[in-house]
Amino acid sequence: MKLTVTLPTHSYDLTIETGALDKIGTWVRSLWQPQRVAIITDETVNKLYGAAVEKELQAAGFETSLIAVAAGEQSKSLEIAQLLYDFLAEQQLTRSDGLIALGGGVVGDLAGFVASTYMRGIHFLQVPTTLLAQVDSSIGGKTAVNTKKAKNLVGTFAQPDGVLIDPNTLKTLEPRRVREGIAEIVKSAAIADVELWHRLSSLENEQDLVAHAEEIITACCKIKRDVVEEDELDLGLRLILNFGHTIGHALENTAGYGVIAHGEGVSLGMIQITQVAEQQGLSPLGTTQELVTMLEKFHLPVTTDRWSEERLYQAITHDKKTRGGQIKIIVLEKIGQAKIVSLPTEEIRAFLNREGGI
């Protein structure tokens, strides 16, 4: 399956095909002429796919170099970005060369950020190997690194030249990482596609979903593609993709990156915001329970111990959706349809101080 993301200044294809990674050299050759290519990956993915990917690229005529960062959210930092700049300079990469992000969401965000800022921008490709990256973060051009203050605080919008998605990589993904991606799939269905919601309802468990991965990934990519085409720079409609993310990011930040995985934070965030939206008449009664039923089926968290209200408040009010003392909150009008509401930041405290906590 091939989907095209059509934007005013730059369009590119999403290739979704089981076994596509085995033909990565041919795919890259169809987009770029032989040149230097740097691969940024993490240590886990490198052990699984690094050598094979380099071999395929070299067979297609590319001169390759590879660097593997530590796996995990801690690598998504300005310090690691600096190391990558130095690596690219040592490899003498120029603006006529290219970079490939091979890995999950952390690698994609980090490598995209580095590509968009090294020499004021070089060409790059996304090759996501986790379910979360395949259905969400590899598409749309958002790149970022974290700081101690907030997740994704420093970043750019930079579109890749292409995205290659091979569902076979899910076979080597640990169950927790599969569930992370499922949280984003549930989010996508909840905000924009009731038919996908019904399809997810028909699946028995995570294994059943992975067995139908190409179909499910394609449906999510269509949602992301359609939203990004209408709002590339996150000024309006694209904000709906952040359903569950404001509180989710805050939970990740206050717990310490990696303690709560991104998908787990999104799962908790979707439940919390929908509980409040129901109380305020913004979402129909029963919407939270529909989410709980779906998320629990895939063994995603729906409750957690109360975190420090003040730390959560500070993290949320540093969220990039906060402007002029107002924060944009995404709520469900119904399953399959989301809307954006603006709230004064001080009202966020009411969200965090509900009886029973998050």
Curated annotation (Swiss-Prot):
Main location: cytoplasm
GO cellular component assignments: cytoplasm
Organism: Enterococcus faecalis (strain ATCC 700802 / V583)
GO biological process: amino acid biosynthetic process; aromatic amino acid family biosynthetic process; chorismate biosynthetic process
Binding site for Zn(2+): 184, 245, 262
Disulfide cysteine pairs (residue numbers): none
Pathway field: Metabolic intermediate biosynthesis; chorismate biosynthesis; chorismate from D-erythrose 4-phosphate and phosphoenolpyruvate: step 2/7
Lineage of origin: Bacteria, Bacillati, Bacillota, Bacilli, Lactobacillales
Domain of life: Bacteria
Name of this chain's protein: 3-dehydroquinate synthase
Keywords on record: Amino-acid biosynthesis, Aromatic amino acid biosynthesis, Cobalt, Cytoplasm, Lyase, Metal-binding, NAD, Nucleotide-binding, Zinc
PANTHER family per record: 3-DEHYDROQUINATE SYNTHASE (PTHR43622), 3-DEHYDROQUINATE SYNTHASE, CHLOROPLASTIC (PTHR43622:SF7)
Cofactor(s) this protein cannot do without: NAD(+); Co(2+); Zn(2+)
Function: Catalyzes the conversion of 3-deoxy-D-arabino-heptulosonate 7-phosphate (DAHP) to dehydroquinate (DHQ).
Reactions accelerated catalytically: 7-phospho-2-dehydro-3-deoxy-D-arabino-heptonate = 3-dehydroquinate + phosphate
Cofactor annotation comment: Binds 1 divalent metal cation per subunit. Can use either Co(2+) or Zn(2+).
InterPro entries according to UniProt: Dehydroquinate_synthase, DHQ_synth_AroB, DHQ_synth_fam, DHQS/DOIS_N, DHQS_C
